[in-house]
Amino acid sequence: METGTSRVKRGMAEMQKGGVIMDVMNAEQAKVAEAAGASAVMALERVPSDIRAAGGVARMADPTVLEEVMKVVSIPVMAKARIGHIVEARVLEALGADYIDESEVLTPADEVFHIDKKDFTVPFVCGAKDIGEALRRINEGASMLRTKGEPGTGNIVEAVRHMRLIQSQIRKIQSLAKDELYAEAKNLGAPYDLVLYIHENGKLPVVNFAAGGVATPSDAALMMELGADGVFVGSGIFKSDSPEKFARAIVEATTHYKDYKLIAEVSKNLGAPMKGIEISKLHASERMQDRGW
């Protein structure tokens, strides 16, 4: 089978199903994540809460960070590129990143166009807060989706909103008559063939993970309960009081999300989680989820 085909890239993303993908800033953190059972790591210079606090322009991480992390772990390594920044994505592909996240956490390089992801061998991850965004990203070649949530806040409310909305929109598309799908595709700004796929299959054609605000084992389990295929944890782990224990607890809660006694057990004595931010306190310009279209 030819490498870089849509089928191969989606298959690679499918392999992450049920897993936890953790943000790491150095080789040491990457080793902690792998030992805790992470299915992959996201190598970056600053976690979303630090990016939010620092302000200014957030760009692709120094390639050294990615190289250091790739040397010490055997699990896949992801890295973030700015929305629309073709060259950052090409650089990450050249460095050997296993997946690229075209991420709203970084400052967008292009406010009109996303990257043409079909043109790359490496699979892409993209954020989506509704079904229209999800299908537009898939049409551009995304092999994996995640809720946008509101990164770096430690507040799960937006990730819950996005996951519930996407699930309800899937159910709506399924309920429509076939001849109504053209108008629905137009309303969503999405390709008809992808709307038809959802109508016939009752699901997205790629995996959809939860991200943006996952801060506790219960948060991770909640997102799985709502239909997520897995979980991204950004600031939540290494901003907590005991990262090793916290990372293991998140993995356990994600894997056994219906075992509430186990979740209670792994949640004990974890120390304080990261300090959260109330979404209503954010200015419109601080809302990362509204980047991209």
UniProtKB/Swiss-Prot annotation:
One of its GO terms (molecular function) is pyridoxal 5'-phosphate synthase (glutamine hydrolysing) activity. Gene3D superfamilies: Aldolase class I. It is an enzyme of class 4 (lyase). Pathway: Cofactor biosynthesis; pyridoxal 5'-phosphate biosynthesis. It holds the Pfam family SOR_SNZ. It comes from the Bacteria. SUPFAM superfamilies: Ribulose-phoshate binding barrel. D-ribose 5-phosphate binds at residues 23, 152, 213, 234-235. Keywords: Lyase, Pyridoxal phosphate, Schiff base. Its EC number is 4.3.3.6. GO terms for biological process: amino acid metabolic process; pyridoxal phosphate biosynthetic process; pyridoxine biosynthetic process. PROSITE patterns: PDXS_SNZ_1, PDXS_SNZ_2. D-glyceraldehyde 3-phosphate binds at residue 164. Disulfide bonds: none annotated. It catalyses: aldehydo-D-ribose 5-phosphate + D-glyceraldehyde 3-phosphate + L-glutamine = pyridoxal 5'-phosphate + L-glutamate + phosphate + 3 H2O + H(+). In the presence of PdxT, forms a dodecamer of heterodimers. Catalyzes the formation of pyridoxal 5'-phosphate from ribose 5-phosphate (RBP), glyceraldehyde 3-phosphate (G3P) and ammonia. The ammonia is provided by the PdxT subunit. Can also use ribulose 5-phosphate and dihydroxyacetone phosphate as substrates, resulting from enzyme-catalyzed isomerization of RBP and G3P, respectively. HAMAP family: PdxS (MF_01824). This is Pyridoxal 5'-phosphate synthase subunit PdxS. The gene is pdxS.
